[in-house]
A protein has these predicted regions:
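Short aromatic-glycine-(Arg/Gly/Cys) micro-motifs in beta-strand/loop hairpins
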Residues: 1-13
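Serine/threonine-rich, low-complexity intrinsically disordered segments
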Residues: 4, 18-20, 38, 53
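A short, exposed loop/beta-hairpin motif centered on an aromatic-Gly-Thr core
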Residues: 10-26, 80
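Short, mixed-charge low-complexity intrinsically disordered segments
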Residues: 34-87
Length: 87
């Protein structure tokens, strides 16, 4: 089951994320992601869009986190990060 698309900082597709644990992580994310859906219509997962990309925890060092940028139901930009070891 493909549950995400991993892209680099410039949104070039690097890999697909296939992980049941990642699915469990993403189940905690609620809200509208219409802004991302409009900008990146090719990345669609279960009717929702997930832009997943590698990053470091504070912008420096090894990119051992997955970052998800999304828009919540109030239209606010949100970021969720997971350590790759967790997923």
């Amino acid at each position: 089951m493909i549950i995400g698309v991993l892209v680099d900082e410039e949104y070039h597709v690097q890999d697909t994320i296939i992980s049941n644990k990642m699915t469990e992580c993403i189940k905690h994310i609620h809200g509208s992601i219409n802004l991302i859906k409009t900008k990146y219509p090719d990345v669609v997962i279960d009717g929702s869009i997930l832009i997943l990309r590698p990053c470091a925890q504070n912008g420096k060092g090894i990119k051992n986190y997955i970052r998800l940028d999304y828009v919540d139901e109030k239209g606010k930009n949100r970021v969720r990060m997971w350590n790759l070891r967790q997923c």
